[in-house]
Regions:
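Short, basic amphipathic alpha-helical segments that act as recognition/interaction helices
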Residues: 148-169
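Short conserved beta-strand and strand-loop elements enriched in small hydrophobics
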Residues: 2-8, 48-62
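Short, ordered beta-strand-loop transition motifs
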Residues: 22-31, 70-79, 123
Length: 169
């Protein structure tokens, strides 16, 4: 079995939580496939990209450099599926093989949660709020910079969560 040591996409090393690398055999051809559980930030970065320059380093010190297609796999955890066509599979004899008609398929989601992934890289999302506040608070909010407001709201929410947990909610 082949073990992936590191993955670099377009020159940038990415944190991989779990992976499966295998040869996929179908009626349309043979492909090298790399399924990765990554952070939501990584998925967001590559979700609209069709092709990537990928370097895969294996624990036996082999390195594969290839232009690979990318698909975002839907499911419980953030996943990328990278794949490229293969003409010669001689150098991939020790890779797992999956046939399109097989019932077995690598499951890389077992034993990891979205909470564990977010401890490594927490995504930020823009949010708009409609509030009804006293005018003095509105004026004060308008004078603040976005970075300060982000920090204030993050702190307030975390403090509120702690209070809720201590009350048993």
């Amino acid at each position: 079995m082949v073990v992936v040591k590191s993955v670099t996409i377009d020159g940038e090393s990415i944190f991989v939580f779990r992976n499966a690398v295998y040869i996929f055999e179908s009626s349309s051809g043979i492909t090298l496939e790399l399924n990765l559980i990554v952070s939501e930030v990584v998925v967001k970065k590559y979700k609209n990209v069709e092709n990537l320059i990928v370097e895969i380093e294996f624990e036996d010190d082999r390195i594969i450099n290839s232009i690979m297609h990318v698909k975002i796999l839907s499911g419980g955890l953030p996943q990328l599926n990278l794949f490229c066509a293969l003409d010669d599979i001689q150098e991939y004899q020790d890779f797992d093989r999956v046939n399109e008609n097989d019932s077995w398929f690598p499951n890389i989601e077992d034993g990891i949660t979205i909470e564990e992934i977010r401890k490594v890289e927490m995504p930020n999302e823009d949010v708009g709020l409609k509030l009804n506040l006293p005018i003095d608070q509105v004026e004060w909010l308008k004078k603040q910079k976005k970075k300060s407001l982000n920090e204030i709201f993050q702190e307030m929410i975390y403090e509120f969560w702690e209070k809720q947990e201590s009350k048993g909610f």
